[in-house]
Curated annotation (Swiss-Prot):
It catalyses: dUMP + (6R)-5,10-methylene-5,6,7,8-tetrahydrofolate = 7,8-dihydrofolate + dTMP. GO terms for biological process: dTMP biosynthetic process; dTTP biosynthetic process; methylation. This is Thymidylate synthase. The keyword Cell membrane does not apply. Pathway: Pyrimidine metabolism; dTTP biosynthesis. GO terms for cellular component: cytosol; mitochondrion. Homodimer. The active site is at C171. The gene is tms1. Gene3D superfamilies: Thymidylate synthase/dCMP hydroxymethylase domain. It comes from the Eukaryota. Belongs to the thymidylate synthase family. The lineage of its organism: Eukaryota, Fungi, Dikarya, Basidiomycota, Agaricomycotina. Keywords: Methyltransferase, Nucleotide biosynthesis, Transferase.
Length: 296
């Protein structure tokens, strides 16, 4: 079975057996709680970039680099043509969250801030947080290198104290890394288990699968390991009601082989050294795009 079939089967199951529920956005969802996890092989430089519709690769990579660099200003992405955070960073949305004192685009202490500065006092998206808080991402990298059997290689974006200050609380909120130690002289292998409390199956999950796969490849590259597997456990897995028609089209399509990742240059040793141009995705031949509206 193709790894993408797990995703398609989950959508079918949600559509057939899920509960109709109201939601924060007012759109309405069909929801299933805690479905079986999704497992994607990352071996041989595989990237599980969904093929039953074209996925916005540039947006995925730019957002991931925005996370890993600890940034929280959505305008940085928007200026690069990546508009995925524009709705949540708009002045009207910030005002609806009681955050109208912030300038447009300032999302608050969201993902990247928690990854790189957990526990620091958030001022605004323009402040310098160098050396402040816990740099969880660097700690994960250090542990993978120095203590690979550690059971505490955790990266958490969920900080209850900071949630009221966030434009949107984290959906993909925690991951754990695991180093498989070989019996021979082969490279150690790195796997990632990610938990996502809220999973928009139509728009969000294709992004999240590829993003955490690429993050695992990045961390493997700078730790001298090789990426093995991405496992994703979902909490509230849902289909927005205005995505049903589009997903029915997608479900008719046959998955194609996943692409491979190649690094454009040698010598990347630090997680902050990666640039968009370093990610070369080879062999991506998806079906055409399918338009779906984002609920804000």
């Amino acid at each position: 079975m193709h790894d993408e079939d797990q995703y398609l089967h989950l959508i079918r199951r949600v559509l057939d057996t899920g509960d109709l529920r109201p939601d924060r956005t007012g759109t309405g969802t069909i929801s299933l709680f805690a479905p079986p996890n999704l497992r994607f092989s990352l071996r041989e430089s595989t990237v599980p970039l969904l093929t039953t519709k074209r996925t916005f690769l540039r947006g995925i990579v730019e957002e991931l680099l925005w996370f890993t660099n600890g940034l929280t200003d959505s305008k940085i992405l928007s200026d690069k043509g990546v508009k995925i955070w524009d709705g949540n960073g708009s002045k009207a949305f910030l005002e609806s969250r009681g955050l109208g004192h912030r300038r447009e685009g300032d999302l608050g202490p969201v993902y990247g801030f928690q990854w790189r500065h957990f526990g620091a006092e958030y001022e605004d998206c323009d402040a310098d947080y160098a050396g402040k808080g816990v740099d969880q991402l660097r700690e994960c990298i250090r542990k993978i290198k120095e203590n690979p059997t550690d059971r505490r290689i955790i990266l958490s974006a969920w900080n209850p104290k900071d949630i009221p200050s966030m434009a949107l609380p984290p959906c993909h909120m925690l991951c754990q890394f695991y180093v498989h130690l070989p019996a021979d002289t082969a490279k150690p292998e790195l796997s990632c288990l990610m938990f996502q409390r809220s999973a928009d199956l139509g728009l969000g999950i294709p992004f999240n699968i590829a993003s955490y796969a690429l993050l695992t490849h990045m961390i493997a590259h700078v730790t001298g390991t090789t990426a093995r597997e991405l496992i994703i456990q979902l909490g509230d897995a849902h289909v927005y009601r205005d995505h049903v028609e589009a997903l029915e089209v997608q479900l008719q399509r046959e998955p194609r082989p996943f692409p491979k990742l190649r690094w454009a240059r040698d010598g990347i040793t630090d997680i902050e050294d990666f640039e968009y141009s370093d990610f070369v995705i080879e062999g991506y031949n998806p079906h055409p795009s399918i338009a779906m509206k984002m609920s804000v």
